[in-house]
From Swiss-Prot:
Belongs to the UMP kinase family. This is Uridylate kinase. Keywords: ATP-binding, Cytoplasm, Kinase, Nucleotide-binding, Pyrimidine biosynthesis, Transferase. ATP binds at residues 9-10, 45, 49, 140, 146, 149. Its main location: cytoplasm. It comes from Haloquadratum walsbyi (strain DSM 16790 / HBSQ001). It comes from the Archaea.
Length: 241
């Protein structure tokens, strides 16, 4: 079974905490040892936003700001690589071909951003499609997909299950609202829809949530299930193993 995990920068490295990085690396290694082909895409988080904000004040244009964000994601990716064992490709993958080659030869592949204008949410979805992954997991700072931004609206309701088309419909208005925060961005949602990719959005602060979702199909997040994916997640996971 082939799995792509997107780990938000604010989940992996909200501050420089070696133990947190080690805990996420341990889950990635556990999945690899269980026989899964694994790739992880790491975001930039608050550090990237801080650098981008300062660079914007200095007059950097949007492409330059994106490049700074990409650099930070790759630094975070290097942190995760440093915590992983001998099965990881020691280089941060710079494109989908590099990541795909590593996965197909049995290595764990780690990548950050790759091009201006594209978030690591979208990179993870595109990578999952490129390597023909069975499952895409978004480990975010939010415990699923809501009908509104839960950080600003107390009445926001969480979805336990969505079709890919419904995910696009939920995320699209958030992408238009200044200051709103969607758990995955609109481009990622559209890529998930195009690929018919089975996807989970969950709270990644505790990396054990990732392990439980992949190994046992158990989590408290949101399942994105393509139209032909009729089984519940636990049944589907065990059937795919």
């Amino acid at each position: 079974m082939r799995v792509v995990v997107s780990i938000g920068g604010s989940v992996l490295a909200p501050n420089l905490d070696a133990r947190r990085v080690e805990d996420h690396a341990a889950v990635v290694e556990t999945l690899a040892e269980a026989g899964y082909d694994i790739a992880a895409v790491v975001g930039g988080g608050g550090v990237a936003r801080d650098y981008i904000g300062t660079a914007r004040d200095l007059g950097a244009n949007e492409v330059q700001l994106d490049q700074i964000g990409i650099d930070v994601t790759r630094i975070n990716a290097r942190l995760l690589i440093a915590a992983l064992g001998s099965r990881v490709d020691p280089k941060v993958a710079r494109d989908y071909e590099d990541a795909g080659d590593a996965v197909r030869r049995g290595d764990i592949s780690i990548m950050g951003g790759i091009m201006p204008g594209q978030t690591t949410d979208a990179v993870a979805a595109a990578l999952a499609e490129y390597v023909d992954a069975d499952l895409l997991v978004y480990a975010t700072s939010v415990d699923g997909v809501y009908d509104a931004d839960p950080s600003s609206q107390d009445e926001a309701q969480k979805y336990t299950q969505l079709l890919p088309t419904e995910l696009v419909d939920v995320v699209a208005p958030m992408s238009r609202d200044a200051g709103a925060s969607a758990p995955v961005d609109l481009l990622a949602a559209k890529l998930i829809q195009r690929a018919g990719m089975r996807t989970i959005v969950l709270d990644g602060a505790d990396p054990q949530h990732i392990e439980s979702a992949v190994l046992d199909g158990e989590h408290n997040g949101t399942d994105i299930i393509p139209p032909d994916g009729k089984d519940d997640l636990a049944t589907w996971v065990h059937a795919e193993q």
